[in-house]
Amino acid sequence: MKAENIQLGIAPIGWTNDDLPELGAENTFEQCVSEMALAGYTGCEVGNKYPRDVAVLKHKLDVRGIQICNAWFSTFFVDGKREETIQEFIKHRDFLHAMGAKVIGCSEQSRSIQGTTKAVFKEKPIFNDEDWQRLAEGYNELAKLAAEKGMKVSLHHHMGTGIQTPEEVDRYMSVVNDDVYLLFDSGHLYYSEGCQKAMLAVLEKYIHRIVHVHLKDVRDEVVAEVKAKDLSFLEGVKKGTFTVPGDGVIDFKPIFDILEKYDYKGWMVVEAEQDPALANPFEYALKGRKYIREVAGV
């Protein structure tokens, strides 16, 4: 890949998990961002231990050579919470803009089971036509609000939500306007479909509307257990569903090849939530960085 096209970041979820705060509760913000920099990353997303004061956060990141590239935002358009979502989005947008980010990664969390004990494969929400209409209207509005600050809105397809499968990604992309984008996540698509082919098909199909990339690997044996025992998304996380690139079943070279073929310019972010007591965050950050350097050449 062309180094000038790619910026490489890592998410703090490997140090402290926002959905399971007890995972990594002992890890401090300063430790997290210092280890990111030591491992060779120049950007990150935002975790629950990050200072929310822009000046304070900027200083702590600047001295480490780290910048914010995105932060998760939950939308609830399908549930009818349009105005509340928009008001919260404006605050989120303004924070990210002040931090220099260009992309806002959103997830439609209406009826999501990702934070519950429900079986992630059998009990995920299914949206009807009215749901999709509400979602499209909401995301089209977010795109306009993001554009006011020169930013782009992207949707993060995610296990346990109404936009998980390739078919649901297709529906999302067909109902929203062209100025609404996609956050591609290798791990969530592989997890959902259980194969590399389906994941790569989504990447290539929508490459021109992908504005942010999450790199996460998957442990097949854990996914098999999640399916066999009807486990929840978070139970899978604790058992080790996800890991850094190069440590699981996904072959990332075809991903990098597609991104290079279509001249993708932007961030690739290692986002691999694990139990830090079992997978030392710094060591795994180094492992992922080494693999990306060797396979992608960046």
From Swiss-Prot:
Catalytic activity: scyllo-inosose = 3D-3,5/4-trihydroxycyclohexane-1,2-dione + H2O
UniProt keyword Translocase, yes or no: no
BP GO annotations: inositol catabolic process
Protein's UniProt keywords contain Lyase: yes
EC number: 4.2.1.44
Alphabetical UniProt keywords: Cobalt, Lyase, Manganese
UniProt GO MF annotations: manganese ion binding; myo-inosose-2 dehydratase activity
Necessary cofactors: glutathione; Co(2+); Mn(2+)
Enzyme class label: lyase
Annotated Pfam families: AP_endonuc_2 (PF01261)
NCBIfam families in the cross-refs: myo_inos_iolE
Protein name: Inosose dehydratase
Family statement: Belongs to the IolE/MocC family.
Alphabetical list of InterPro entries matching this protein: IolE, IolE/MocC, IolE/XylAMocC-like, Xyl_isomerase-like_sf, Xyl_isomerase-like_TIM-brl
SUPFAM superfamilies: Xylose isomerase-like
